């Protein structure tokens, strides 16, 4: 009928299917087996994004998938075969299935049809299948309309979906952030009634948090949603969270901003327990540590900065988020090497202390020069101190009004 034709047309989307997947599809079709692109790739295509990863689903059993792939001379990996998943040509192909048991790793799977496979998925917007030949979406849950209306809704009964796997609670909020949408009423009620993340690994919590910050449309709204449903205290135990939350795409900047009121000495161990990497911890703690900066500590701070992978602009941007100007600290370069007349007779710790003292003077002088440059263009006299130490003095101790007055008395700069 005309109505049916219009409904089918509404399901047509543009999805650029990679040539290797087209090859796999032809092999399956030749063997009279179904093969669909599923999940994230379909969702992203509808949102106008270019999918990076393609997952496939089929009615063929794992052994049949291996046999078909062998016919086409394609490389296969059987990792996950017991759960109905086989890798062919770098793409995961999962047999339609029902999961038996709770959690991310079900005890077993029961092979099913496409309807059964759809019913086991978490959200309607993630339950869309793409028919490669017809160039249209197969939608058995209303997910296409939910995606167009920017609504996050579970497949089936929300409580049941969340009880099966509590991680789905965070995924629901993450996808709400990604599409910039709102929560379905029943889904929201289920979250409010049972916000517990018990049984969810810290690694998965970290992963969902980072994706929500960096892939969501607004990190501030994402964090406020986590607050609303009672997740932040579970995700960041022992930590004080500073509000208002910022809207930034970098989770490093985000965490450094909201954690800046915490004891920087305790942060590394806490973040380590929350499964953040050593690199992430160094970057976050360095930024938080900047609140304790004093000129006499410039040497120590620059050494800490060297151990991070932070770009200069990232540090400057962090300063802007908390109302500070870190550009002078960031752009300052250590230059004292520990040689020259100033170090004659010094040993061990004395040398280190002298280096730090001179670097502090360098830093302070750069600051003064930046501030008074319009008034003071150059040095007009040569002091006896400068004559004595010559080039070393010019290289390691740039002139500042305060320093020179102390060292050479009445001579004018």
Please report, for each region that a protein language model flagged, where it lies by residue.
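Catalytic cores of the polymerase beta-like nucleotidyltransferase superfamily
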Residues: 3-370
